[in-house]
Amino acid sequence: MNVAPEPGAAGAAAPQGRKLLRLEVRNAQTPIERKPPWIRTRARMGPEYTELKNLVRREGLHTVCEEAGCPNIFECWEDREATFLIGGDQCTRRCDFCQIDTGKPAPLDRDEPRRVAESVHTMGLRYATVTGVARDDLPDGGAWLYAETVRAIKELNPSTGVELLIPDFNGKADQLGEVFEARPEVLAHNVETVPRVFKRIRPAFTYQRSLDVLTAARQFGLVTKSNLILGMGETPEEVRTALVDLHDAGCDIITITQYLRPSPRHHPVERWVRPEEFVEFAQYAEGLGFAGVLAGPLVRSSYRAGRLYEQARSRNTSGASNSG
């Protein structure tokens, strides 16, 4: 239900002039939290980053890295890695941590896969991550768009690795199958949080269905990946249990990060997880047998994605040869 902002919600204006949702008004009663000293980055503008920055500006290209203000842009661009958002800037679902707005999406842009592929080519990327909004308004849930973007990138950039971060397509096997057939190097679907708080944080998704998406991708023969965001009300024991669930579901690669609140209308930060806790979670995940693990306050699901894929592929290959 939409409601008008209350006085405490000042500064939490909703996008595109819409009224704040009741949940957003409640969230806005909590001021934006002060970040702890370990949540900081230093700009290291090496030659690769500077070249890409100038090229992106000159060619009018669009990346999530810049438009979302990602703190890791300097490192990723130095490695010739970047992330692209497809499907528009309006999502048909609302997650309480996500900065992408919920609304009625624009009509499907069938030329978008070609433009993304050309951007990858122009930027000379070694590894490209493609993510997008949920498109429940489309008959196929956007499956063609996700699959075609992978196909277009691979056709124009045969040596570039592609990681595809997808919604759950409501668990529909035909839509998931169409996406899997495009065979990205990594198929990612982010669980994001633990079962107890899942419904509150991601009401349009279900925890088990997200696990099932990863299982289906793994059974198809794809390298799988997921992400957990900490600081939204979970306990350390629940994090460990979720890691077990993800590994049992067939997830190869896991990233673990700190929740950073995008605006006052988003879910308040309930806890700042200390760096040493991330080290402990990473060690626990490695002990479970994940092929690739990256955890830290400023890690994002696409952070060092190419390196993590190579690490996972190496471990999977090594494990297969040792078991033989």
UniProtKB/Swiss-Prot annotation:
[4Fe-4S] cluster 2 binds at residues 91, 95, 98. It is an enzyme of class 2 (transferase). It is found in: Cytoplasm. Keywords: 4Fe-4S, Cytoplasm, Iron, Iron-sulfur, Metal-binding, S-adenosyl-L-methionine, Transferase. Its cofactor is [4Fe-4S] cluster. Its EC number is 2.8.1.8. It comes from the Bacteria. GO terms for cellular component: cytoplasm. Its main location: cytoplasm. It catalyses: [[Fe-S] cluster scaffold protein carrying a second [4Fe-4S](2+) cluster] + N(6)-octanoyl-L-lysyl-[protein] + 2 oxidized [2Fe-2S]-[ferredoxin] + 2 S-adenosyl-L-methionine + 4 H(+) = [[Fe-S] cluster scaffold protein] + N(6)-[(R)-dihydrolipoyl]-L-lysyl-[protein] + 4 Fe(3+) + 2 hydrogen sulfide + 2 5'-deoxyadenosine + 2 L-methionine + 2 reduced [2Fe-2S]-[ferredoxin]. GO terms for molecular function: 4 iron, 4 sulfur cluster binding; lipoate synthase activity; metal ion binding. Belongs to the radical SAM superfamily. Lipoyl synthase family. This is Lipoyl synthase. It comes from Mycobacterium marinum (strain ATCC BAA-535 / M).
